[in-house]
């Protein structure tokens, strides 16, 4: 196996960087800074960063088949245009919960945009419990609510055969699986496939590789872990020089590089001096596995 190399490729100083997505068409990495209310597109070749500031926390971003992007902003599913900096609301959720916001989101293989909510935090990972729900924005802009009683709706992805939906509610310290019906978007038969170890801390963002194994970013754990969803075993741990790793995706040529986002918020001055790259974008090469291209929202 080739040697693993970890480097901070963009010192962005995100309060809480999240939702990395590779955009093959532009050879760029998309990501957000949730408290910074920013959506960013970074081109590793030219080093150019395009930024777009919102009026509410922007928590996830995804590609859109018809062009531009979709994002979760506050409690709204929105369409974004980076060129003219426009934001168009497509749907709103949790109207009865004024203290809620979206968190992580991702598009399924049929082009539906799944995203979940949570209560606003009073400090990182400190919040009113059981206030969140999981939703999906269908291509016709209708919203389906799947379940509620969620603490921090987080990482999500689908198995390579599209028959299993993987999902993380962070404060359950578990990676869960559901049976998935791609035709209808229905989920059923929830079960836990991996419980995090104490030193792994809080499960956050997640992605899948071409071997069907899951990669989970561990918030406060300073690592990404590779899991076998069939055996429930951890296969690999890759530690980063920052504590608050938040999410991960594959990208670059052939999707052979992993990009990892992280946070600065919640670190005291002493911790920040020890990890000056906190809030940056990290690239991991030499993992010996590849990812799959992200799906695009079909609406």
Swiss-Prot record:
Cofactor: Zn(2+); Mn(2+); Ca(2+); Mg(2+)
Subcellular location per the Swiss-Prot or TrEMBL entry: Cytoplasm
GO cellular component: cytoplasm; nucleus
Any GO BP: L-ascorbic acid biosynthetic process
UniProt-annotated catalytic positions: 204
EC number(s) stated in the UniProt entry for this protein: 3.1.1.17
Pfam families reported in the protein's UniProt record: SGL
UniProt binding sites for a divalent metal cation: 18, 154, 204
Modified residues (N6-succinyllysine): 144, 244, 253
Binding positions (substrate): 101, 103, 121
InterPro entries for the chain: 6-blade_b-propeller_TolB-like, Regucalcin, SGL, SMP-30
Pathway given in the UniProt record: Cofactor biosynthesis; L-ascorbate biosynthesis via UDP-alpha-D-glucuronate pathway; L-ascorbate from UDP-alpha-D-glucuronate: step 3/4
GO molecular function, one term: enzyme regulator activity
Cofactor remark from the record: Binds 1 divalent metal cation per subunit. Most active with Zn(2+) and Mn(2+) ions. The physiological cofactor is most likely Ca(2+) or Mg(2+).
Principal place of residence: cytoplasm
Catalytic activity: D-glucono-1,5-lactone + H2O = D-gluconate + H(+)
Organism domain of life: Eukaryota
Keywords: Ascorbate biosynthesis, Calcium, Cytoplasm, Hydrolase, Metal-binding
Assembly, per entry: Monomer.
Family under the similarity heading: Belongs to the SMP-30/CGR1 family.
Function text: Gluconolactonase with low activity towards other sugar lactones, including gulonolactone and galactonolactone. Catalyzes a key step in ascorbic acid (vitamin C) biosynthesis. Can also hydrolyze diisopropyl phosphorofluoridate and phenylacetate (in vitro). Calcium-binding protein. Modulates Ca(2+) signaling, and Ca(2+)-dependent cellular processes and enzyme activities.
The protein's name: Regucalcin
Native source organism of the sequence: Oryctolagus cuniculus
């Amino acid at each position: 196996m080739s040697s693993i190399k970890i480097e901070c490729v963009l010192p962005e100083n995100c309060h809480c960087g999240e939702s990395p997505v590779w955009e093959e068409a532009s050879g760029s990495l998309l990501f957000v800074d949730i408290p910074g209310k920013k959506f960013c597109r970074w081109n590793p070749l030219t080093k150019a960063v395009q930024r777009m500031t919102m009026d509410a926390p922007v928590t996830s971003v995804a590609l859109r088949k018809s062009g531009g992007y979709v994002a979760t902003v506050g409690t709204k599913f929105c369409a974004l245009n980076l060129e003219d900096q426009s934001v168009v609301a497509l749907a709103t959720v949790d109207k009865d919960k004024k203290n809620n916001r979206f968190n992580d989101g991702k598009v399924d293989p049929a082009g539906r945009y799944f995203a979940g909510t949570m209560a606003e935090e009073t400090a990182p990972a400190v919040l009113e419990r059981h206030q969140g729900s999981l939703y999906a924005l269908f291509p016709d802009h209708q919203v389906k609510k799947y379940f509620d009683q969620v603490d921090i709706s987080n990482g999500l992805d689908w198995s390579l055969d599209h028959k299993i939906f993987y999902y993380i509610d962070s404060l359950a310290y578990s990676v869960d699986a559901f049976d998935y019906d791609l035709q209808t978007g229905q989920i059923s038969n929830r079960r836990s496939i991996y419980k995090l170890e104490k030193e792994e801390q809080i499960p956050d963002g997640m992605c899948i590789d071409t071997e069907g194994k899951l990669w989970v970013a561990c918030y406060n754990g300073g690592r990404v872990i590779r899991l076998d969803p069939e055996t429930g075993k951890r296969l690999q741990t890759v530690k980063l020089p920052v504590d608050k790793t938040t999410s991960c995706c594959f990208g670059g040529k052939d999707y052979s590089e992993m990009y990892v986002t992280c946070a600065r918020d919640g670190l005291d001055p002493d911790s920040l001096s020890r990890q000056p790259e906190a809030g940056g974008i990290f690239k991991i090469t030499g993992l010996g596995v590849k990812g799959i291209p992200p799906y695009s929202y079909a609406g």
